[in-house]
Amino acid sequence: MSAILPNAPREGIVINLAAMRIFYYPKPKKGEPQLVYTHPIGVGKVGWSTPEGTTRVVARETDPIWRPSAAVRREHAENGDPVAKVVKPGPDNPLGKYKFTLGWPSYLIHGTNKPYGVGLRSSHGCIRLYPEDIEQLYQMVPLGTKVTVVNQPFVFGWHQGQLHLQAYTVLEDDPRDWKKAQKTLLAK
């Protein structure tokens, strides 16, 4: 797959919210080119946005237990879908089989039991992956890996002497004025 990479350090995990993609740059072996693995993701819905910035993977877990916050439980109950205070591993657990805990409290990178939410703003701020994609990343991503989250609806890249632009839908709650920013973006 060809994709224009986000404007971010090419190390560890990089998440582009607008593109709804995760990129993993494993440390290259001496003398070998840098590899990048990329997968589609689901991100935080309006009102539950995924934060931008830099953090690290502080824990890794297989068959995680989900302990939803009171606010998440309340929202589920209001929508006619009550959830328990503790959800054990298994097919009803929305975290799926694997999770990475981030240095930001309450934010995770994890699998899902509802794959239709990948590619959408469907979470309470966490980053969701298809079960097979989180399984692949879980085998590769070590504890302490740097995680950079950006929101770049417009990405640029050079390929064979030509400048390419890839545009994604601007997230509904993105406060930036992208019409004013067009000239600045194109000047770079």
What are these regions (language model features)?
Residues 123-138:
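Short beta-strand-centered segments at strand-helix junctions
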Residues 115-125:
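Short, basic/aromatic beta-hairpin or loop at an interaction surface
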Residues 56-59, 128, 149:
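Structural signal for conserved beta-strand scaffold positions within catalytic alpha/beta enzyme cores
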Residues 140-156:
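A short beta-strand-loop micro-motif that forms or neighbors metal/cofactor-
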Residues 2-117, 136-143, 159, 165-188:
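Gly/Pro-biased beta-strand-loop elements
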